[in-house]
Design a protein with these regions (language model features):
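Short, cysteine/histidine-rich loop/knuckle motifs that typically chelate Zn2+
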Residues: 140-145, 164-166
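Basic DNA-binding region of bZIP-type proteins
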Residues: 166-183
């Protein structure tokens, strides 16, 4: 559908947002320690510098809200957001090949701060969605009690629920019980 790097970056963006309180598996903030940032970095195969500092932790936590905005923006707003992010970072896209990955785009140097790389890589991936008129693949979970986000990579764009808290099943059970109560 999209390049592997685009899909991976979008899924990493959703995973980052879903570390927020209320969106995470635990319901608590899951990005509170330097080790949490390091685990996120390794888990999503980021490359480049990792400072492993309190400052970096604060910066990555702060960028979550800006990344979240991509999941709720209109196509025009997302395009403006992408342009603003790329301009502020003085992004210069270039093709790179490293660590067993085929050619893909990087837009900031490897020594750029991790939070900046997250935001710029997310913006580059979102630009693919904007150009393909597929921004609707970035969604907020349809469950009333969930604030998680998701990337819908299904062919028919039918995914409605996140993978964080069993939301689809809980919603279906609740609807079933409501129907039964009406019929009882």
């Amino acid at each position: 559908m999209f390049g592997d790097d685009t899909e991976s970056v979008l899924q990493a963006a959703a995973a980052l947002v879903n570390t927020e309180p209320g969106a995470s598996h635990s319901g608590a903030d899951e990005l509170t320690r330097i080790e949490d940032v390091a685990a996120f970095y390794a888990g999503w195969s980021y490359s480049g510098a990792l400072a492993r500092s309190e400052r970096e932790l604060a910066a990555v936590r702060a960028v979550r809200e800006e990344v979240r905005r991509f999941f709720a923006e209109s196509r025009d707003d997302a395009a403006e957001h992408v342009n603003r992010v790329l301009e502020q970072a003085a992004a210069l896209p270039r093709l790179v090949k490293h660590d067993g990955y085929d050619w893909h785009l990087h837009a900031v140097p490897n020594d750029a701060p991790f939070d900046q790389r997250i935001l710029v890589e997310t913006a580059m991936a979102v630009s693919d969605l904007v150009r393909a008129d597929e921004l609707g693949r970035l969604k907020e979970c349809a469950a009333d009690d969930c604030t998680a986000v998701l990337v819908d990579l299904s062919r028919n764009r039918s995914k409605r629920f996140c993978d964080v808290g069993n939301c689809g099943n809980r919603t279906n059970v609740s609807a079933y019980r409501a129907r039964r109560a009406l019929g009882a």
